[in-house]
From Swiss-Prot:
GO terms for biological process: biosynthetic process. The lineage of its organism: Bacteria, Bacillati, Bacillota, Bacilli, Bacillales. The modification N6-(pyridoxal phosphate)lysine is found at K243. One of its GO terms (molecular function) is pyridoxal phosphate binding. This is Putative pyridoxal phosphate-dependent acyltransferase. It comes from the Bacteria. Its cofactor is pyridoxal 5'-phosphate. Keywords: Pyridoxal phosphate, Transferase. Substrate binds at H135, T357. NCBIfam families: gly_Cac_T_rel, PRK06939.1. InterPro entries: Aminotrans_II_pyridoxalP_BS, Aminotransferase_I/II_large, AON_synthase_class-II, AONS_Archaea/Firmicutes, PyrdxlP-dep_Trfase, PyrdxlP-dep_Trfase_major, PyrdxlP-dep_Trfase_small. CDD domains: KBL_like (cd06454). Homodimer. Belongs to the class-II pyridoxal-phosphate-dependent aminotransferase family.
C-alpha cells in the first residue's frame, strides 16, 4: 500500500526532531537589526546577514518610500513585457560600475540568479566542475542545466586541475565551467581565485563566482573578485542584494554580451515579475553608499575581529574563517542545538547550524557580527559565551 502524505510527513518530522535536526522558526517583532525582539524579549542578534546594517538604514528607507510614491508598490509585469522601469535600468548600471563590468542584470533573489544563469549557458553537452561546499542554489542550478556535474574537493587546487584536465581532454563536452562561492558561508573561508583563474586559463574553463557573502564585505565592498583584482578574468560575478546590501534580490555582472543573453534566455527573468520599485531604489542607494565610502565596511571588519579575538581567548574553535563570518564549532548535533538555546536564554540570539547544512559531527553556531553592533553588545555576547561554555563544560 502506498504511503499517505500524513504518514510521510509524520515519520520524517519525528526523525528530524529525534536527531536534533529540526529547527524551530522564531518570529521577530520589528526590524532585523543588531538587537531584535522575540516574544517580547530583547536579544543581541548575531544571526542575520545584515552585514553593514543597511536593512534599517534611514537613507534607504527614505529612498524606498519616495520610489513607492512615484512608481507604486509593484512593477506590474515581467521585465520583457513592460515591467522594466527606469529604476531597474539605473540599478543595473550602478551594479555594473560597482562590480567593474560592462553590464549587470538584477533578479528577484540570489537563489534565482544561480537557477537562471547556469541553466541559460550550460546544457547536457557540457560539464560543470563545482566545489563540494557550494551553496544549495548552485547545486540546484547545476542540476537544472542537465550538464555533467563533477564535484571538486573543497578549495583543493590539485583536485581541480586533475578533474579539469580529465574533463577537457575527454573530448566529451562542448563547454566546461568551474563554479565556486567567493566566500563560503559556513566557515568564512575565501575561494583561491588567483589559482582558479590560472587553472581556468590553462584549460579554457568558464569561471563563475557566487559572491553572496563577499559583496559588500570583501574588496573594500566591491567583492571577492575585486579583492584579488580579477574583474576581467571572471566570466560570471553573482551576488545577492539581501545580505550586505540589506534589501532583497540578486544580480549577475559580466560582459554586455553575457547580460544580453541572460535577458533573452534566463527563465526567472522571463517568467517572474521584476523587483518592486521601493526595493529597487533602496538597493541603488545602498550600492552608491558602498561606492562612496568604506566607513561601514571598515566598521564591520573591526567588529568582526573584536568578536573573533574574544571568542578565541575563551578557547572556542572558530575554524579557519578569513571573513566576518565567525563559526564556533561544537560538534555533536544535539549539543550544538542545546548550546544555541542556552545562549538564547542569556540574551544572545545565534542559531545552530547542523547536518545536512554542514557535515555530521561539525555542528556549530555561526556568529554574524555587523557594522551596526556596538562594542558593548559584543562584550555582552562574549560574556554569555563564557558563562554557557563553562556550564556545559565546552571551555
Amino acid at each position: 500500500m502506498v504511503q499517505s502524505l500524513h504518514e510521510f510527513l509524520e515519520e520524517n518530522i519525528n526523525y528530524l526532531k529525534e536527531n536534533g535536526l529540526y529547527n524551530e522558526i522564531d518570529t521577530i517583532e520589528g526590524a532585523n537589526g543588531p538587537e531584535i525582539k522575540i516574544n517580547g524579549k530583547s536579544y543581541i542578534n548575531l544571526s542575520s546577514n545584515n552585514y553593514l546594517g543597511l536593512a534599517t538604514n534611514e537613507d534607504l528607507k527614505s529612498a524606498a518610500k519616495a520610489a513607492i510614491d512615484t512608481h507604486g508598490v509593484g512593477a506590474g509585469a515581467v521585465r520583457t513585457i513592460n515591467g522594466t522601469l527606469d529604476l531597474h535600468d539605473e540599478l543595473e548600471e550602478t551594479l555594473a560600475k560597482f562590480k567593474g563590468t560592462e553590464a549587470a542584470i538584477a533578479y528577484q533573489s540570489g537563489f534565482n540568479c544561480n537557477m537562471a544563469a547556469i541553466s541559460a549557458v550550460m546544457n547536457k553537452n557540457d560539464a560543470i566542475l563545482s566545489d563540494e561546499l557550494n551553496h544549495a542554489s548552485i547545486i540546484d542550478g547545476c542540476r537544472l542545466s542537465k550538464a555533467k556535474i563533477i564535484r571538486v574537493n573543497h578549495s583543493d587546487m590539485d583536485d581541480l586541475r586533475a578533474k579539469a584536465k580529465e574533463a577537457v581532454e575527454s573530448g566529451q563536452y562542448n563547454k566546461v565551467m568551474y563554479i565556486t562561492d567567493g566566500v563560503f558561508s559556513m566557515d568564512g573561508d575565501v575561494a583561491k581565485l588567483p589559482e582558479i583563474v590560472e587553472i581556468a586559463e590553462e584549460f579554457g574553463l568558464l569561471t563563475y563566482v557566487d559572491d553572496a557573502h563577499g559583496s559588500g564585505v570583501m574588496g573594500k565592498g566591491a567583492g571577492t573578485v575585486k579583492h584579488f583584482g580579477l574583474q576581467d578574468k571572471i566570466d560570471f560575478q553573482i551576488g545577492t542584494l539581501s545580505k550586505a546590501i540589506g534589501v532583497v534580490g540578486g544580480y549577475v555582472a559580466g560582459t554586455k554580451e553575457l547580460i544580453d543573453w541572460l535577458k533573452a534566455q534566463s527563465r526567472p527573468f522571463l517568467f517572474s515579475t521584476s523587483l518592486a520599485p521601493g526595493d529597487t531604489k533602496a538597493i541603488t542607494e545602498a550600492v552608491k553608499k558602498l561606492m562612496a565610502s568604506t566607513e561601514l565596511h571598515d566598521k564591520l571588519w573591526d567588529n568582526a575581529q573584536y568578536l573573533k579575538n574574544g571568542l578565541s581567548k575563551l578557547g572556542y574553535d572558530t575554524g579557519e574563517s578569513e571573513t566576518p563570518i565567525t563559526p564556533v564549532i561544537i560538534g555533536e548535533e544535539k549539543t550544538t542545538q542545546e548550546f544555541s538555546k542556552r545562549l538564547k536564554d542569556e540574551g544572545v540570539y545565534v542559531k545552530s547550524i547542523v547536518f545536512p547544512t554542514v557535515p555530521r559531527g561539525t555542528g556549530r553556531v555561526r556568529n554574524m557580527p555587523t557594522a551596526a553592533h556596538t562594542k558593548d553588545m559584543l562584550d555582552e555576547a562574549i560574556a554569555a559565551y563564557e558563562k554557557v561554555g563553562k556550564e556545559m563544560n565546552l571551555i
